[in-house]
Amino acid sequence: MNLDALQQRLGYRFSKPELLQQALTHRSHSAQHNERLEFLGDSVLNCAVADMLYGMFGKLDEGDLSRVRANLVKQQALYEIAQMLQLSDTLRLGEGELKSGGFRRPSILADALEAIVGAVFLDAGFDAARALIRKLYIPILEQVDPRTLGKDAKTLLQEYLQGHKIALPQYNVIATHGAAHSQQFEVECTVPKLEVRVFGTGASRRAAEQAAAKLALDEVQKLVPQLLKRSRAERTGKTRKQPQPQDPQLSLRLKE
């Protein structure tokens, strides 16, 4: 298997190419598979990402750092990076996995990426693995807000309203549809002060509330800047209309 193109995309060339080949080998293909490398890579990845976040975001507390890290190393994030690296083109899968589309499966691709991190660690040590992880993650971190990454819509809406001293939203289930085993909930979310009223649906009350909160947040983020602008304009207008106090010395001089 020619892995030159993948090594170029990784920005790292293995001194022991067999480690990379093993990292790309699923257990359905061979007994010499990537699961041990995946175990190792998972730990290296968590440590390197924690180190990177600690250095980049000095104002985030422990809870926020943990939240951001969890979102960066979860399966979906690893899957998206694996797609960017085109790992599906280089995976070694058994015949059954190939036929079932295993090369597209998020779990298999995410595991392979962790195994590659483990392989780099064995090939050249922690510094090399950390350099690879930084190369993969820095472009992602430049496009996200660490203060909001991983927070759900209800939390974001609540924090936004609290930040502008607006009363919290109200959620009410207004309808349920379908049979008991496949119900759909419809939830109303209102922000009375801003006259926002939206509706969300979902397979559970929580999912419906999240859907409604997302719509409400979109509306609130449009309205609040307009209200702030209007409020500033009104304050400026009142200031301009106030009469200037008369200088008493000037008044005396005029009388003379």
Curated annotation (Swiss-Prot):
Region (Disordered): 229-256
CC cofactor: Mg(2+)
Keywords, in A-Z order: Cytoplasm, Endonuclease, Hydrolase, Magnesium, Metal-binding, mRNA processing, Nuclease, RNA-binding, rRNA processing, rRNA-binding, tRNA processing
GO BP terms: mRNA processing; regulation of gene expression; rRNA processing; tRNA processing
CDD domains: DSRM_RNAse_III_family, RIBOc
EC numbers on record: 3.1.26.3
Active site: 42, 114
GO terms assigned for molecular function: double-stranded RNA binding; metal ion binding; ribonuclease III activity; rRNA binding
Entry binding sites for Mg(2+): 38, 111, 114
Location of the DRBM domain: 152-222
Predominant subcellular localization, coarse grouping: cytoplasm
Leading EC class: hydrolase
Keyword Zinc-finger (UniProt): no
Transmembrane stretches, start-end: none
InterPro entries: dsRBD_dom (IPR014720), RNase_III (IPR011907), RNase_III_dom (IPR000999), RNase_III_sf (IPR036389)
Location in the cell: Cytoplasm
Gene Ontology cellular component annotations, sorted alphabetically: cytoplasm
UniProt cross-references to Pfam families, sorted A to Z: dsrm, Ribonucleas_3_3
Catalysis: reaction(s): Endonucleolytic cleavage to 5'-phosphomonoester
Residue ranges of every copy of the RNase III domain listed in the record: 3-125
UniProt subunit comment: Homodimer.
Membership in a protein family: Belongs to the ribonuclease III family.
Purpose: Digests double-stranded RNA. Involved in the processing of primary rRNA transcript to yield the immediate precursors to the large and small rRNAs (23S and 16S). Processes some mRNAs, and tRNAs when they are encoded in the rRNA operon. Processes pre-crRNA and tracrRNA of type II CRISPR loci if present in the organism.
Record NCBIfam families: RNaseIII
Protein name per its UniProtKB record: Ribonuclease 3
Natural source organism: Cupriavidus taiwanensis (strain DSM 17343 / BCRC 17206 / CCUG 44338 / CIP 107171 / LMG 19424 / R1)
